[in-house]
Amino acid sequence: MFPVDKFQDTRTPFYYYDTQLLRETLQTIKEESGKHANYHVHYAVKANANQKILRIISQYGLGADCVSGGEIKAALEAGFPADSIVYAGVGKSDWEIELGLQNDIACFNVESIAELEVINKLAQKHGKKARVAFRINPNIGAHTHANITTGLAENKFGIAMQDMDKVIDEAQTIDNIEVIGLHFHIGSQILDMGDFKALCNRINDLQNQLAKRNVFVQNINVGGGLGVSYDLSLIHISEPTRPY
């Protein structure tokens, strides 16, 4: 219940977070994901990097999905173990990559051979072996706004499917790189779960393609993008708040 009385003297604007609801949601995620072996949920730190919120999330065993050095720092400060932090995103700068290497984070999600070469060079500099997952563009459309779909061949993200074998082969010849997985992300604000089913079917095809070449990866990251329905009847909001 929203504690309206407590906020009558609070200056606006301000953010109110229902941490009890957050904890209940996290507990549900923990219980449901625990029903499946080797299934891990990561929180996208870009959604909200408030330290109090991050600390609560870390207490429930979720990993952290980061897209900047600042987010890696925030996740570490909030108590996320380094081996639960994944660094995704385009345009990673040297200092951000080095931060991930120095803290031995779980994985770098790599968008291109050029990025892989930079990570390898920095890993060599620090005497590290960087664990990486390649972001593959699966050419899967998502039922969402055209400006926030990211999984079609025409989109600028990831490595084309036809280049996957070549990229993995090249990576396996690089001393300071360990390929541990594949990464996918088809868009944001996705409400049709059929989109994720189509993605998983495509991933199975790609894994079979790799298996024929005796190539196996440890991790599959299906990305995020679960949407929020804004089709909410206002009567559920207007009636309880009418007295105020």
What are the roles of these predicted feature ranges?
Residues M1-A130, D169, I174-E178, D205, ...:
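A charged N-terminal "starter" segment
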Residues P13, N103-V110, T150-M161, I190-F196:
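Flexible, glycine/proline-enriched loop segments at strand-loop-helix junctions
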Residues L54, E77, I97-Q102, I119-L122, ...:
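Short acidic, glycine/serine/threonine-rich loops at helix termini
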Residues E115-N176:
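Conserved anion-binding
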Residues F134, L182, I220-V222:
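Buried hydrophobic side chains on well-structured beta-strands
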Residues E170-D192:
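Gly/Ser/Thr-enriched, mixed-charge loops and adjacent short helices
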Residues I186-G187, I220-G227:
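Glycine-rich beta-strand-to-loop/alpha-helix junction loops that act as flexible
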Residues I235-Y244:
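Single conserved hydrophobic/aromatic residue that forms the stacking wall/gate
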